[in-house]
């Protein structure tokens, strides 16, 4: 095994390391599809897709293109590569986080939310980038530094009806799908 003798550490526990999180997600997805098949509720003719690590999960669990063991090796290697693309302190902290922004709760349009995120990046000189528009005007994934995301949260305000327009995603310290990871993608 190429990882023999390697010790993995994270201040919050190894499941917060993306390589282990991705393995856990792949294992869960495969188990869920297997359970649906066993229960007779999985529609084999349905179109199935995944996003990001979910693409690998769909290939393995749904199509059988990848065996489970190969899937787990692949997503572990993928997560390890992403983990190492991000500078870290001696304690393993990266200085990056991922947040969910809900523009409608701050009474912002799609364009206003996009401009706000860009202005935080420009004003702070740090990464703050919408990396996925999950639902236009309702839910965006934003990657950034701890400092930039704190400023974004401040500018978004408290929201309405007791619902915050800003939610920090716990346990994520890799700025997935952002410009910060471009060095890891060959041209």
What is each model feature region?
Residues 61-187:
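Alpha/beta catalytic cores of group-transfer enzymes, especially the acyltransferase/condensing modules
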Residues 1-113:
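FabD-like malonyl-/acyl-CoA
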């Amino acid at each position: 095994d190429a990882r023999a003798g390697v010790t993995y550490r994270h201040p919050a526990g190894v499941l917060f390391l993306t390589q282990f999180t991705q393995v856990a997600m792949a294992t869960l997805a495969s188990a869920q599809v297997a359970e649906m098949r066993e229960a007779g509720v999985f529609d084999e003719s349905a179109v199935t897709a995944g996003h990001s690590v979910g693409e690998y999960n769909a290939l393995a669990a749904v199509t059988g293109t990848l065996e489970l063991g190969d899937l787990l090796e692949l997503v572990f290697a993928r997560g390890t590569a992403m983990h190492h693309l991000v500078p870290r302190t001696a304690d393993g902290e990266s200085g990056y986080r991922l947040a969910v922004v809900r523009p409608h709760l701050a009474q912002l349009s799609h364009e206003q939310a996009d401009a706000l995120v860009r202005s935080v990046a420009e004003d702070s000189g740090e990464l703050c980038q919408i990396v996925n528009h999950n639902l236009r005007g309702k839910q965006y994934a934003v990657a950034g530094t701890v400092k930039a995301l704190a400023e974004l949260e401040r500018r978004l305000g408290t929201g309405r009806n007791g619902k915050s327009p800003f939610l920090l995603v716990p346990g994520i310290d890799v700025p997935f799908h952002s410009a910060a990871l471009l060095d890891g993608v060959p041209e």
